[in-house]
Amino acid sequence: MSDVPLVKVALAQINATVGDLAGNGAKIVAAARKAYAQGAQLVLAPELALCGYPPEDLLLRPAFMSACAAALEGCARELADLEGLVVVVGHPHQLGESGDVRSKSVAVQLRFNAASVLTEGRVAATYCKRELPNYQVFDERRYFASGRDSELPALVVKVGGIAFGILICEDAWFDEPAELARAAGAEVLCVINASPFHLGKLAEREERMAARARATGLPLLYAHLAGGQDEIVFDGGSFALDAAGRVGARAAMFEEDLAIVEVTPRSVRGIVADIPSVEAQAWAALVTGVRDYVDKNGFPGVILGLSGGIDSALVLAVAVDALGAARVRCVMMPSPYTASISWIDARDMAERVGVRYDEISILPMFEAFKASLAAEFAGRPEDATEENIQARIRATLLMALSNKFGSIVLTTGNKSEMATGYCTLYGDMAGGFAVLKDVAKTLVYRLAEWKNAQGPEIIPRRIITRPPSAELRADQTDQESLPPYEVLDAILQRYMEDDQGIEEIVAAGLPRADVERVTRLIKVNEYKRRQAPIGIRITHRAFGRDWRYPITSKFRA
């Protein structure tokens, strides 16, 4: 009979909501009870799972910190009857007079991103995160002190004969925290996480954690959040690696899961979920983001303008997958420039997905606006002013329906348009949530094709194949105002996500005139983007929390 100890560990992949201490605590307790019933001895809940991530300036409110402390104690009491079970919970920790972590600093209260060990009805120990990310969407140094300011350099907890070292997210991306845990006797590394999704992030995580496992010679368990929080999506995919960095277990992506992993000091074993395709991950992120933003904020449903174009068609498809057809309403608002095929395709799409579809002509309102402004505009030709009036009339109609019925307006503009300002302030930009804000136009087409390939074909073929147009004047197409989307999106990728300058982008083979124009448009339209609704982040550089450029600036790379 083998003398090698074996412990069942549960990775409690929950969908937390910021500020819902009771609800999040209940999810942690429920997951722990379910895991205990399956023989687990150790349960890992994600980073800041108790309060949700990111809590932002809630952390600066004393009442919030006090409530978090009380909720943690409450979880410990709720789990007291589960004999021998150890639960690790992520939460914010305020060091006060009754704190169980003593500060090396003098006469100041410190706030930490922490992980506490709950067992036998009490909070037995607390570890404080050492490495605080302060890039992209992260602002942790604004809120937290480093665990280096505590007297506990590492936390190792013995469960079932195995010593588990506790780390928090960014800690595992650096050498020192893991080495401190190993020096303290850890035989397995446990990393609790709140790591926002972007395309390619799961592979990046697994590669970095595999390198950490190999460097330390220790298995590594990675517990992660799932679900949406404002513009951020957490993709789940919690996993377990053996000491050689091989994946031995992986939870489902983009949904709550409880992964039970059999762990020894060298090996891990559990169910390994597949990794979806890039398109499937992008789709799941959009669906998750819409569903959780709408549901967590208590909206009864969504409303959007359906134009017969590909962007609004894709948003409609996402919304139906996220919420169900009964909670989605779309409105076609034709103008004198709306092609008959746009009407036909919009109605066809709405019928295919089974949503409520209404038509409201903007012609009477458009004519009234032009008549009211005729004296002021006398002698001046029609231009973008009249085009923008149409977009703003549509926004007024959608917002009126939103006010009357309570549904939130989904905007339908994409990242390529948002970058270049090819959108109307207080027009098509008006709404509560921008589904495609981080989806470039070329990816819009890929996702439309992917969605149809899953069957049944819900986006009419002509919507995908016809040239895109705002239909705000006769015979208008997007390419009259913008470079081809393949060129535009390649420039955006290099300029936004890779931080390349104009000369580097031109050297890569992209036309100088287009590069100069697009980068200028990005700069001069910053004021527009500041007034846009938030939208789902799916790349590692989105217009939102991780794009913080000044509006007034003379610099252009």
Predicted regions and their residues:
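ATP/NTP-dependent adenylation/nucleotidyl-transfer catalytic domains that generate, transfer
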Residues: K158-G160, L218, A243, S267-G308, ...
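Enzyme catalytic cores with a strong preference for nitrogen-chemistry domains
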Residues: M1-G305, L316-A325, M332, Y357
